[in-house]
Amino acid sequence: APIKVGDAIPXVXVFE
């Protein structure tokens, strides 16, 4: 599954 904003790792996944 693609990484969503605010997934498991803070900061990471900020690909809006």
UniProtKB/Swiss-Prot annotation:
It catalyses: a hydroperoxide + [thioredoxin]-dithiol = an alcohol + [thioredoxin]-disulfide + H2O. GO terms for cellular component: mitochondrion; peroxisomal matrix. The keyword Transmembrane helix does not apply. Keywords: Antioxidant, Cytoplasm, Mitochondrion, Oxidoreductase, Peroxidase, Peroxisome, Redox-active center. It comes from the Eukaryota. GO terms for molecular function: thioredoxin-dependent peroxiredoxin activity. It is found in: Mitochondrion; Cytoplasm; Peroxisome matrix. It is an enzyme of class 1 (oxidoreductase). Disulfide bonds: none annotated. Its main location: mitochondrion. Its EC number is 1.11.1.24. Monomer. On the 2D-gel the determined pI of this protein is: 5.8, its MW is: 16.9 kDa. The active site is a conserved redox-active cysteine residue, the peroxidatic cysteine (C(P)), which makes the nucleophilic attack on the peroxide substrate. The peroxide oxidizes the C(P)-SH to cysteine sulfenic acid (C(P)-SOH), which then reacts with another cysteine residue, the resolving cysteine (C(R)), to form a disulfide bridge. The disulfide is subsequently reduced by an appropriate electron donor to complete the catalytic cycle. In this atypical 2-Cys Prx, C(R) is present in the same subunit to form an intramolecular disulfide. The disulfide is subsequently reduced by thioredoxin. Belongs to the peroxiredoxin family. Prx5 subfamily. Thiol-specific peroxidase that catalyzes the reduction of hydrogen peroxide and organic hydroperoxides to water and alcohols, respectively. Plays a role in cell protection against oxidative stress by detoxifying peroxides and as sensor of hydrogen peroxide-mediated signaling events. This is Peroxiredoxin-5.
